[in-house]
Structures are given as C-alpha cells and as structure tokens.
C-alpha cells in the first residue's frame, strides 16, 4: 500500500487537539473546497465501531464514502478504515502526542487505488501529492480554528 504522512505541531493541549478530531463534523470544516466533502451521517460522540458517511466530489459525480472507526485510544489515536468509497483500500490514523507545552498531530494514510502497476503509478504521481496537499491544508485550518476557539 502507498503511504502518506503529514505531521504538525499545535499550540494546544493534546486533549484539546484530540477532542477536535473526535468531532466528525469538524472534518467538513477543515477540508479544502476541492473536492467538496459533506457529512451525511456522523454519529456523535465518535465511538469504536461507528460508521461515518460522507459525500465526496462535485455533483453529479459525487461518491459516498463510508468509513468505520477501527481503532480508538482516547486522547492519542483515532483510526478510520474505508468500507465503501473511491479507494480499493484506505486506512487513516490521526495520532496525537504531547510536544513540549503543545501537541503534535500526525496523519498517516495507507491506501491502494487500483491493484495494478498503473494504479501504483497514479498513486505515486497523482494521489499521493494531492493527499499531502489536502493534509497540509487540513492542518492549517485546524490550527486556525483551534486558535479562534482558544482566543
């Protein structure tokens, strides 16, 4: 599987950063406008085994993305695994760790688009850079939203 990782430091307590990511509604708030990402069903509070459903992409080609919460270590780790969506396989971990007087968020995604060499080529040249850019944007938005909430 192809791996993408993005890590950033935040000037908030790890508990606040983790709580922010436990609210699935925040995903729409931090996602870039490309492609559109709309929550359809996001049980609150987030629990192990929950299924979260989103619509991804512009109308009329939007797809349903269904992910299950497959790991949950309160305050430290939230993992979602795609059950239905655009990827053959998708596992995304949100890891939160203390970092001095703040915290660190590390997003780790392991994915497979297609089970072929062409799929690996597309993943490496297209999907990987797009995901890295998306997580860079999400970390920036998270930082801004947490700063606004804090102040």
Region annotations inferred by a language model:
Residues 13, 74, 99-102:
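Short strand-connecting beta-turns/loops that link adjacent beta-strands
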Residues 38-84, 104, 140-143, 148-150:
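Glycine-rich portal/gate segments that line the openings of hydrophobic small-molecule binding cavities
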Residues 133-141:
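A non-catalytic, amphipathic alpha-helix used as a structural packing/dimerization or gating element
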Residues 81-132:
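Beta-strand/loop substructures that line and gate deep hydrophobic ligand-binding cavities in soluble
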Residues 1-47:
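Hydrophobic ligand-binding cavity/cleft-lining segments
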Residues 17-21, 27, 52, 69, ...:
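Hydrophobic pocket/interface hotspot
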Residues 7-11, 55, 68, 95-97, ...:
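Generic structural detector for well-ordered beta-strands
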């Amino acid at each position: 599987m192809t791996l993408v990782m993005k890590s950033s430091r935040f000037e908030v307590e790890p508990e606040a950063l983790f709580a922010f990511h436990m609210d699935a509604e925040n995903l729409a708030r931090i996602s870039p406008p490309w492609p559109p990402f709309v929550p359809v069903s996001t049980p609150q509070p987030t629990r192990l085994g929950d299924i979260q459903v989103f619509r991804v992409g512009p109308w009329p080609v939007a797809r349903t993305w269904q992910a299950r919460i497959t790991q949950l270590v309160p305050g430290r780790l939230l993992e979602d695994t795609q059950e239905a969506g655009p990827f053959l396989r998708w596992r995304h971990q949100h890891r939160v760790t203390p970092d001095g007087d703040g915290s660190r968020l590390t997003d780790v995604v392991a994915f497979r688009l297609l089970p072929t060499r062409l799929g690996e080529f597309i993943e490496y040249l297209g999907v990987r850079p797009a995901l890295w850019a998306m997580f860079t944007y999400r970390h920036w938005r998270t930082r801004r939203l947490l700063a606004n909430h804090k102040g």
